[in-house]
């Protein structure tokens, strides 16, 4: 396979989802917290900063998982081919964590806390990188999906 990181991330997300479902339910907020979902009070007051990373691999229900993985498959496969495995993985992981940090900062400002999970921040980072590449190369590069 030409896109091992994309495939690996998709498989990892599916595996984590199956483990969550076999040990409880991805629709159960308490179970998701036990599995590493993000919740600002636990991160800040409890010092559980790992949640900014672990929540990227958790999803609330099969639709949530499938939507994120579909976009990751379509855009991630092509982006990984263009920029390489290491850069792609860094964009995905750093983008996901930064997205979660931004959510945390917004929640601290608004004092409106919610349990959160999902790869959306990472997937949006992949989208952003793809858009950047298209804009930078608009005169001589076409993305064939």
Label for each model-derived stretch:
Residues 1-145:
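A detector for small-residue-rich transmembrane helices and their helix-helix packing motifs
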């Amino acid at each position: 396979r030409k896109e091992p990181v994309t495939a690996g991330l998709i498989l990892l997300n599916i595996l984590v989802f199956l483990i969550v479902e076999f040990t409880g339910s991805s629709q159960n907020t308490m179970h998701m917290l036990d599995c590493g979902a993000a919740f600002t009070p636990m991160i800040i007051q409890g010092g559980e900063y790992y949640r900014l990373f672990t929540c990227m691999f958790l999803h609330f229900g099969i639709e949530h998982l499938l939507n994120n993985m579909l976009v990751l498959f379509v855009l991630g496969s092509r982006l990984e081919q263009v920029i390489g495995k290491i850069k792609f993985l860094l964009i995905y992981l750093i983008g996901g964590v930064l997205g979660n940090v931004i959510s945390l900062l917004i929640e601290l400002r608004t004092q409106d806390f919610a349990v959160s999970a999902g790869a959306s921040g990472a997937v949006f980072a992949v989208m952003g990188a793809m858009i950047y590449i298209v804009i930078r190369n608009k005169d001589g590069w076409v993305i064939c999906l």
